[in-house]
Amino acid sequence: MAEPGIDKLFGMVDSKYRLTVVVAKRAQQLLRHRFKNTVLEPEERPKMRTLEGLYDDPNAVTWAMKELLTGRLFFGENLVPEDRLQKEMERLYPTEEEA
């Protein structure tokens, strides 16, 4: 089933390929830092219903797509180089191996 807002996401990029790359890279960042670096507010986070109740959805791709829909993420040219951004994110959100 397609995610809600997929048409809006396609309208934000020049190709399906770019959307795939942007979402995949953001999902990797979210997983690497255990979702601590999300731009979503708690009430905006994707939810998953289980027998025990409602929990944050563990699917990083869903989170990345939802983040992109908020307009709080930027992608494209003339941004901070990826290696510099990665160092800053590691400083702010250390992974378990680094902590």
Curated annotation (Swiss-Prot):
EC numbers on record: 2.7.7.6
Top enzyme class: transferase
Gene Ontology CC annotations of this record: DNA-directed RNA polymerase complex
Entries under Pfam families matching the protein: RNA_pol_Rpb6 (PF01192)
UniProt feature coiled coil, ranges: none
Catalysed reaction equations from the record: RNA(n) + a ribonucleoside 5'-triphosphate = RNA(n+1) + diphosphate
Protein's recorded name: DNA-directed RNA polymerase subunit omega
Native species: Thermus aquaticus
Source species taxonomy: Bacteria, Thermotogati, Deinococcota, Deinococci, Thermales
